[in-house]
Structures are given as C-alpha cells and as structure tokens.
C-alpha cells in the first residue's frame, strides 16, 4: 500500500475483499492511504511479538521498521513534527533492541552464506527466495520463472571480450542497470569497505586455452590473469602502456563523459553485491533473499528525523554507523562533524549503502530532491525531468480496463 500511493499518488484504495467484476475505478487521497497504513501498522505493533523475522513473516520489529519508514515519508510531505519524532523513536527502538548488529567485515553482509534473511545479522525483513527449479517454475514453459533476478540484472557484457566466456562465477550478462559516474565517485575506497565489496571492476580470463584471436589482441594475456579492468578514475599513461598487450583497460573517461553521460553501455563497473556463485549456469535467478529493510536504514531514518531537533544525537548515530563500514584503522577518517550532516550527506550515504536495493527513487521523492538530483547527475534524463515525475504514470492497461474513463484519468503531465 505504501508503494502504491508513493508511486502513483491518489489512486484506488481497496480495504474490502473484491467478490465480483469491478469496472469502475475511483481515486482515494494519499491521506486516506496513510490512515490505513498507520492503522494497520499500529495493529501489528500492538499485537505481534517482538523479535527478528526468521521466516519472511511479519514481527513487531518489522512493523516498527516499516512504520519508521512511513512516518519519515509522511513527515517530509506534511512537515508534522510528531511524525519526525515517532520515526526517530521507532528506528532507535530497533537499533537498541540488540537483535541486529553489523558485520565487522562488510563482505560478510553479502556473502552467499549469509543470504538467508532469517539469519543475516543486518536484515530486518526480507522476501524469501530459493534455488529450487521446481519452485521457480523452471519446468513450466508457460510460466514466468520466479526467483531473485538480482544475480543477472546488474551484470555487464563481459562474455564478448578477449579471454572471456560466459560462466557461473561471472553470471549471465543482462546489463539492465549501470551505475552512474556520480555513484562511483561517492565512495572513498581508501577508508570505506563498501566500494570493493559492492562493485566489481576486474574480470579474469576464463578461456582455457586462450584462442588465437584473443592472443592477437593481447599477446601477453594469460588464462587466470586479468582480462578486463575498469577504473573509476582516470588511468595513467604507464597503466595504459602496461595493459595494452595484456588486457582491456577502460578508465572512467572511456565509460562516461566528464559530465557523467554514458559513452559505453555494455562495459562498466558492475554492482556486484547480489552475486551468487552457487547458481546454475543457465538460470536467471538465485537463492538470495531480497532484503527489504536492513539495520543501516534505521540509522538513516533516525538521523534524518532528528536533523532539525537533535542534530548532535543524529551525528552520533551516523558516526556509530560509519565506523562500522570503515576499513579497519580508518574509523576516525569516516566520522563526520555536525556541520557535515545535511540532507545531502544522508542521501549520499543512503546511495553508498543501499544502491541497487530499489529505494533510491523513493528517497529522492521523499526529500523533494528528485528533479534536482536528476538534473545534476543523470545526463540521459536531465533535459526531460519535471516536477510531475514525482508521481509515475498509471499503467495504460489499467486505464483501458475501466469504464469511467472520463473520471479515472492518467496522472497529471503524462500523455493519455
């Protein structure tokens, strides 16, 4: 319900079971949606037992975490101080429950051994997935395969490069998502663990033996050695010379213009945290649970909610989190001061931590930064983004299906 109203605004709100064909659609306000959202969450908080969700079911902890997110979202829209305060209280309840904790090594957060949300230390709520071919409809030619598609959607086109062929380790290159230059440059990999865990920038020659054509392009290439290296910075002349006979080297200026527009759309630094080395060669799903809410978001919600009323506590919370993501020995370098904690810093931190987890558009909408950030950082969309994009268009098949077309119309700004 939160996703529906935040995506499309004043649309149809059903609170009773539908028993027959309904051909008319009538809008309900965002306020009506949030009344139901908060009422339902209050029931869950009051009636469910506290505890970690170990099986994909809702617990009191999950309800509190969702309500913290909903309170912050609604507070940003209405400016209600009580909603900001409640968001902070709920988020801190989860933080202080001692049922969730951070991995010392960030790579453990995304290790396939910790992909089960029921046992992952940072996961508050997750959608359960499996590697079962039967449960993922692999044997039904008429059905759409289910399962977590994160294993393939972020993978760049590596299998046409010299020395490379498609394999399980590198996954199927569906290349649906490409990181922006802006996102890559948000990370300081000298002090922050997350860049090297989140992204993949090197691919190793997996052909054995290498073909004649491979060695014609790179005569010093060797199986098991580097085949592709993509840099988030500019390469030096010496790096280019070294690579010229060994592997394909792409630096940030090969992949993007200086303004951030993509030059290459098939080769890029790959968002890699959803990789599954246990997957089967020809499948496009994996066993990873999808983490819907994780512990870091509680820190971000609390810090943002207290930004205007208790900034020092907000800074303390943010620093507590940042030190957990620091490279050992670099904890003090990761810490920030009160003057550095702004809504833009929080958004940058959310990008560093939550990229690829399908929450960014909602974050930018909530903070009324969507148009500003797209104009600054998305060169493909900057000339077209407008305020009406704060709502997404209602799917045309929904509009076609209703009989009261003059009353239930497309969201403002979109062509009918």
Regions flagged by a language model, labelled:
Residues 36, 108-181, 282-292, 318-322, ...:
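Long, intrinsically disordered, low-complexity segments
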Residues 15-22:
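Short linear capping/connector segments at secondary-structure termini
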Residues 1-13, 33-48, 55-95, 125, ...:
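Extended, hydrophobic/aromatic-rich amphipathic alpha-helical segments that build helical scaffolds
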Residues 197, 201-323:
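C-terminal substrate/ligand-recognition segments
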